[in-house]
Amino acid sequence: MRPYVILNAAMTLDGKIATATGSSEISGEEDLRRVHELRRECDAIMVGINTVLADDPRLTVHRVDAAPGDNPVRVVVDSMARTPPHFRVLNDEAPTVIGVSESAPPERVAELRKRAEVVVAGTRRVDLHLLLERLHGMGIERLMLEGGSTLNYSMLTGGLVDEVRVCIAPMIVGGRDARTLVDGEGIDEMADAIRLELKRSYTLGEDLIVEYTVKG
C-alpha cells in the first residue's frame, strides 16, 4: 500500500518550471493560494533534495487560513543525506521525514535524526516504492508531490502518481538548459508515453489550471 499521490506544479506555456538561472516565480497569487489549500488537504508534501538546496523552502501552509495542525508532514527524498541541518525544512513548524539510502554517510544521517524522522529505503538511491510504503505505514494516505524535473520523472515512470495538477502561466522563457516539468532519461517510443485523462480545467487570474488522472 502507498499514499494517493498528486503531482502539483507550475510551468510556463513552453513547459519550463524554472529558467536556466533557477528563477521560478511562475504562479500568480490566485494559484499560490490554490497550492496552499491543496497542501492543507494533504497529509504530506514531498520534494527532492535539489529543490531543498535551491530554495530552502518551508513547505508549510501559510498563504491561506490554517491552524498549526494543518501543516502536512514534510518529506525530502535525499539519497545521500545532504539536507543542511539549519535549513527551514527542519524547523519545528511541522514534522519532517527524510528518505535516505543505505549509502548515506552515517554521520550525516545521525545529524538529521536529531531534527527529523529518517527512513532508510534503498541501497544507493532512495527506493521510492519502499519509501511510499513506509510513509503509508506512518498514516500518510494523501501526498502532494512538489518535485523538480528529476523526482517528477522518477515518480511518474515508477507508476507512483495518481493525479497531475498543473498551473500553466502565460509566459514563454525557452532555454535548452531551463528545467522542464519532467526530464530524466525520457521515453523512447511515443506509444509508451504515460497517458493522462483530463478531469478539469479552469482559469485562475491569468493562469490556466489543468487537472488530470494518470491512466493505469
Curated annotation (Swiss-Prot):
The UniProt annotation places NADP(+) binding at 51, 55, 79-82, 126, 148-151
Q: Which UniProt keywords apply?
A: NADP, Oxidoreductase, Riboflavin biosynthesis
Q: Is this entry keyworded Translocase?
A: no
List the GO biological process terms.
riboflavin biosynthetic process
Pathway of action: Cofactor biosynthesis; riboflavin biosynthesis
Q: What is its EC number?
A: 1.1.1.302
Q: Which GO terms describe its molecular function?
A: 5-amino-6-(5-phosphoribosylamino)uracil reductase activity; NADP binding
SUPFAM superfamilies xrefs: Dihydrofolate reductase-like
What Pfam families does UniProt report for this protein, alphabetically?
Answer: RibD_C (PF01872)
Name the catalysed reactions: 2,5-diamino-6-(1-D-ribitylamino)pyrimidin-4(3H)-one 5'-phosphate + NADP(+) = 2,5-diamino-6-(1-D-ribosylamino)pyrimidin-4(3H)-one 5'-phosphate + NADPH + H(+); 2,5-diamino-6-(1-D-ribitylamino)pyrimidin-4(3H)-one 5'-phosphate + NAD(+) = 2,5-diamino-6-(1-D-ribosylamino)pyrimidin-4(3H)-one 5'-phosphate + NADH + H(+)
| Top-level enzyme category | oxidoreductase
Q: How does it assemble?
A: Homodimer.
By sequence similarity, the record places it as follows: Belongs to the HTP reductase family.
Q: What does the record give as the function of this protein?
A: Catalyzes an early step in riboflavin biosynthesis, the NADPH-dependent reduction of the ribose side chain of 2,5-diamino-6-ribosylamino-4(3H)-pyrimidinone 5'-phosphate, yielding 2,5-diamino-6-ribitylamino-4(3H)-pyrimidinone 5'-phosphate.
Matching entries from PANTHER family are given as: 2,5-DIAMINO-6-RIBOSYLAMINO-4(3H)-PYRIMIDINONE 5'-PHOSPHATE REDUCTASE, DIHYDROFOLATE REDUCTASE FAMILY PROTEIN (AFU_ORTHOLOGUE AFUA_8G06820)
Q: What is this protein called?
A: 2,5-diamino-6-ribosylamino-4(3H)-pyrimidinone 5'-phosphate reductase
